[in-house]
């Protein structure tokens, strides 16, 4: 009965281990246990026929139905190490899904045997919810810690609280009775460095001393951050999102989500934000959350032994990261679905939602900003928007798309130059230079002196009677009978005009410095604040606004501009709109946000479809097939497969004609990560596929544990050992590590279909046959090289080293 069920599921009785030991260097998504074979027929008798190749697509899982070997017999004595992956290789999604299905079947068959087995079954069923709960708790706690520490260290550049050293500037003045409404940030307990060192609070000497101390602390924080990254955790640099996208697609980067990376990333993210560099903490918080998810997954065997299941946890963790970065749990789930996840089943959607909920709850409990909100720059707008405002919103979208296209090209050009010149060999010096330039230019301008979150808060917040910002410096006519908060109908004061000039300079400064900052060897996120300015005397608004009415909300324009710029850089759409309206609590502004974000995406796509994360993936040469890219060229599988003309023949193994020495020599003389197995050199009939790593481990294990295995022992991949002379050494059976259902296509299959299959199934390689005879192999790297050639790029320059 069991074998019949397995057959209907698409697995033949002896093919389990073949599926659980598939190939190695490229990439694989969920095949759901079904392998598509583009052959004329699966009947062996038809393989010799002249049926038109590539015209009849069949679904098969290979293998032999007549096998007498039971599926579970192959699992009685598994070879240690077989089925694991080397660093910088890609997982086999089909094998991992089969392993998980077999584990689940085994647990279900035993759970009625005893109370202990039932308890183990319940623990296994709930382990997914437990791991995402722990991930959410840790992500929220670390985000709160990072926010509090970054605020304190940012204020440390300007001064210190004498009454309590651990208070930042705002907290220091909370309990002071000497604070006035106009100068709410000044109190006796808070001392600037000029007051402490030279005893002057005002004057040129005070300004110069504060300037020097600001630069000193900025350089100290930047130097400490880059030194910690370089010495202890090189993977802690950058945003982390390009690598996480690659890891979620199945690539193995050992240590990238480890405990050292988590510790150093948490500490250096605080230092990098406090140093005043033009970067944010949003992307690195996703990396931090994924590190938590990876570490906690090792506590549960269901996830620690299965790379595909582990990536479901990482998808949920990335949702928790965005949830605490922006205070947007639903936006986090959509971000994970839209931007980073390669495989996102419905169960992962629910767990991502729960992880984002837990993380947001923990951060709200910590309340790091003292405003009972998840982020510093939470704002609420109650003024409705008007139809004529759609035009300036769309203009903001155009600006965002142009800015995004410019930023991606400029940043990638600089990063490529960094890689190809000597400058890239001195990351510490680069960080120090960028930090020094940023600090020297930023200090004189109050808007560039603020960190990113405070700047966004300043721009998003609407003017009211309690606001002391110079952006709200409107003249107040004491003789008028108007209400005090009727700001839009008052003329602008000197503070507003000076603030606009400072904001213009801040915008230019941020544009230039962000290009050079994103990608340096410190944790660096990307959140581009934009600015928008309205004055009620502008002709475009004057005809529409009634006298005395709150017609335009300047903070709303800043919010839409920020969303448009971030959309132009990342090419996010749905998740970005949800994140921004969760930030502002304004459901009525969804239409302006959608208009601006879609416009920015369209304008950006006109210059190139890649977002900043995809561009960095391509720059680093990771084997990532982006589903957003279109392949429109009319080539065939035979044009891309290896070996090409004038190449040496394909390295293959025969079913039962090779010795242990022959296989070891082939492994030593080649660098391939797997070898097709054929019946014989004459027939070239395909039998299966064996991984280099599995062959090496299996032979070493056999030499240690089995007597009589020597270099001249015959290696047999067939079910039945061929008859050998009596004096021959004991044969070595390696059928258990053979993938007897490798993915195959015919030589006339269009490459458009092959690329689509690689994307949707996450394949790492497929074999090319003609009437059942092996012709060659196509790996994921071959496809990436071919796509680079068709785009007139150098294929050798895009591969990961």
Swiss-Prot record:
This is H(+)/Cl(-) exchange transporter 3. The lineage of its organism: Eukaryota, Metazoa, Chordata, Craniata, Vertebrata. It comes from Pongo abelii. Strongly outwardly rectifying, electrogenic H(+)/Cl(-)exchanger which mediates the exchange of chloride ions against protons. The CLC channel family contains both chloride channels and proton-coupled anion transporters that exchange chloride or another anion for protons. The presence of conserved gating glutamate residues is typical for family members that function as antiporters. A motif (Selectivity filter part_2) lies at residues 280-284. InterPro entries: CBS_dom, CBS_dom_sf, Cl-channel_core, ClC, ClC3. GO terms for molecular function: antiporter activity; ATP binding; chloride:proton antiporter activity; PDZ domain binding; voltage-gated chloride channel activity. Its main location: membrane. It holds the Pfam family Voltage_CLC.
């Amino acid at each position: 009965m069991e074998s019949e069920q397995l057959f209907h599921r698409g697995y033949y009785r002896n093919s389990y281990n073949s599926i659980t030991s598939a190939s190695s260097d490229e990439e694989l998504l969920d095949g759901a246990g079904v392998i598509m074979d583009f052959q004329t027929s699966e009947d062996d008798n038809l393989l010799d026929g002249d049926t038109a190749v590539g015209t009849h697509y069949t679904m098969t899982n290979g293998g032999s139905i007549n096998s007498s070997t039971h599926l579970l017999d192959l699992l009685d004595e598994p070879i240690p190490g077989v089925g694991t992956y080397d660093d910088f290789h890609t997982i086999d999604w089909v094998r991992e899904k089969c392993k998980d299905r077999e584990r689940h079947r085994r647990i279900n068959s035993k759970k009625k045997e005893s109370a202990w087995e039932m308890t183990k079954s319940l623990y296994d069923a709930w382990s997914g919810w437990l791991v995402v709960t722990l991930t959410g708790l840790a992500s929220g706690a670390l985000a709160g810690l990072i926010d509090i520490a970054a605020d304190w260290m940012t204020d440390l550049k300007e001064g210190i609280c004498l009454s309590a050293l651990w208070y930042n500037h705002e907290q220091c003045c909370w309990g002071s009775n000497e604070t006035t409404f106009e100068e709410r940030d000044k109190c006796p307990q808070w001392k600037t460095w000029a007051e402490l060192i030279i005893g002057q609070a005002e004057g040129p000497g005070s300004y110069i001393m504060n300037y020097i101390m600001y630069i000193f602390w900025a350089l100290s924080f930047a130097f400490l951050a880059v030194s910690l990254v370089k010495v202890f955790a090189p993977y802690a640099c950058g945003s982390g999102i390009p690598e996480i996208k690659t890891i979620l697609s199945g690539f193995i980067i050992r240590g990238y989500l480890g405990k050292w990376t988590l510790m150093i990333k948490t500490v250096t993210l605080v230092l990098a934000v406090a140093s005043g560099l033009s970067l944010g903490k949003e992307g690195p918080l996703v990396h931090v959350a994924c590190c938590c998810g990876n570490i906690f997954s090792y506590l549960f065997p269901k996830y620690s032994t299965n790379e595909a299941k582990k990536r479901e946890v990482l998808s949920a963790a990335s949702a928790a990261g965005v949830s605490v970065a922006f205070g947007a749990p639903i936006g986090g789930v959509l971000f994970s679905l839209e931007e980073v996840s390669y495989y996102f089943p419905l169960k992962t959607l629910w767990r991502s939602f729960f992880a984002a909920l837990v993380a947001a709850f923990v951060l709200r409990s910590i309340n790091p900003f003292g405003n009972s909100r998840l982020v510093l720059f939470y704002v609420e707008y109650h003024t409705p928007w008007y139809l004529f405002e759609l035009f300036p919103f769309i203009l903001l979208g155009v600006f965002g798309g142009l800015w995004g296209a410019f930023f991606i090209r400029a940043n990638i050009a600089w990063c490529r130059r960094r890689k190809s010149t000597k400058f890239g060999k001195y990351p510490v010096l680069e960080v120090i230079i960028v930090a020094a330039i940023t600090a020297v230019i930023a200090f004189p301008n109050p808007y560039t002196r603020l960190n990113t979150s405070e700047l966004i808060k300043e721009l998003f917040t609407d003017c009211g009677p309690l606001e002391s910002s110079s952006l709200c410096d409107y003249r107040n006519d004491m003789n008028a009978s108007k209400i005090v908060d009727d700001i839009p109908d008052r003329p602008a004061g000197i503070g507003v005009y000076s603030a606009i000039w400072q904001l213009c300079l801040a915008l230019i400064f941020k544009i230039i410095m962000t290009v050079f900052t994103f990608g340096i060897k410190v944790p660096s996120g990307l959140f581009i604040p934009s600015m928008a300015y309205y004055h009620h005397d502008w002709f475009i608004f004057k005809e529409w606004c009634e006298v005395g009415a709150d017609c335009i909300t300047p903070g709303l324009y800043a919010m839409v501009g920020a969303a448009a710029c971030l959309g132009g850089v990342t090419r996010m759409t749905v998740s970005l709109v949800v994140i921004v309206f969760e930030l502002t609590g304004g459901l009525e502004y969804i239409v302006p946000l959608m208009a601006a974000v879609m416009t920015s995406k369209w304008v950006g796509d006109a210059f190139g479809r890649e977002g900043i994360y995809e561009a960095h993936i391509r720059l680093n040469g990771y084997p990532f097939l982006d589903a957003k890219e279109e392949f429109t060229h009319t080539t065939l599988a035979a044009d891309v497969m290896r070996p090409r003309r004038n190449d040496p023949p394909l390295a293959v193994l025969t079913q039962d004609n090779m010795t242990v020495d022959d296989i070891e020599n082939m492994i030593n003389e080649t660098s391939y990560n797997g070898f097709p197995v054929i019946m014989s050199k004459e027939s070239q009939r395909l039998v299966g596929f064996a991984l280099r790593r599995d062959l090496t481990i299996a032979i070493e294990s056999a030499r240690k544990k089995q007597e009589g295995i020597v270099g001249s022992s015959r290696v047999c991949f067939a079910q039945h050992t061929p008859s050998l002379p009596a004096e021959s050494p004991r044969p070595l059976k390696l059928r258990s590590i053979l993938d007897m259902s490798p993915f195959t296509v015919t030589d006339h299959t269009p490459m458009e279909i092959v690329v689509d299959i690689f994307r949707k199934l996450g394949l790492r390689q497929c074999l090319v046959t003609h009437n059942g005879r092996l012709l060659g192999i196509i790996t994921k790297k071959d496809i990436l090289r071919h796509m680079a050639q068709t785009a007139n790029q150098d294929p050798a320059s895009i591969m990961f080293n």
